[in-house]
Amino acid sequence: MNNFFQDFNLLFSSSLFSSYMDWFYNFNCSLLFGVLSFVSTMFVYLLLSSFYFKSKKIEYQFGELLCSVFPTLILVMQMVPSLSLLYYYGLMNLDSSLTVKVTGHQWYWSYEFSDIPGLEFDSYMKSLDQLELGEPRLLEVDNRCVVPCDVNIRFCITSGDVIHSWALPSMSIKLDAMSGILSTLSYSFPVVGVFYGQCSEICGANHSFMPVALEVTLLDNFKSWCVGLLSD
């Protein structure tokens, strides 16, 4: 049943948390599809059959019991994995080894590594004439945010003007950036690669040209990147 929803699925999961979210989505879709099939089948059967019910009793206790038990079971089946995901999400925010402050502006992102003095930069979308071979249009930036893999990182999201939203769909990350408010999220990236997202809150004329590019690399490469950026 899960394969049926591949065309309507989330992006390819690149972390443990996003894999759990993907499984939960497929599980709910399969469950709801089963409920829809059962109700539709019963509706068509009763509509086309000559069956009729005749009773002097106004109440039908067994039917009322079924109508109470089955919805309760369905809700319990949804509640158990949902609470497990919520508990796992809470564990992710317990501690962190690196803090990255992300500030949204019209229409670019600013990154500041609070644990590394002087390491801060702005990230703008690359124009068409700046793109190199293989770089995605409207998603590549001039300065990627580089973070090490297998390290718990705390992201502090805020805004310098209007409301923005820092989103990485493949990681199941979406945090609103609001002026005067600091939204935090701790995350560990197990996969090396470059992951793209966009601002997911309409923030003005160039809202569509405000991409997010996060590069996850090995710890040694991250240290070399920090040294190179600080030396510049």
From Swiss-Prot:
Component of the cytochrome c oxidase, the last enzyme in the mitochondrial electron transport chain which drives oxidative phosphorylation. The respiratory chain contains 3 multisubunit complexes succinate dehydrogenase (complex II, CII), ubiquinol-cytochrome c oxidoreductase (cytochrome b-c1 complex, complex III, CIII) and cytochrome c oxidase (complex IV, CIV), that cooperate to transfer electrons derived from NADH and succinate to molecular oxygen, creating an electrochemical gradient over the inner membrane that drives transmembrane transport and the ATP synthase. The lineage of its organism: Eukaryota, Metazoa, Ecdysozoa, Nematoda, Chromadorea. It is found in: Mitochondrion inner membrane. Component of the cytochrome c oxidase (complex IV, CIV), a multisubunit enzyme composed of a catalytic core of 3 subunits and several supernumerary subunits. The complex exists as a monomer or a dimer and forms supercomplexes (SCs) in the inner mitochondrial membrane with ubiquinol-cytochrome c oxidoreductase (cytochrome b-c1 complex, complex III, CIII). This is Cytochrome c oxidase subunit 2. Its EC number is 7.1.1.9. Cu cation A2 binds at C199, E201, C203, H207. Belongs to the cytochrome c oxidase subunit 2 family. Binds a dinuclear copper A center per subunit. It comes from the Eukaryota. The keyword Heme does not apply.
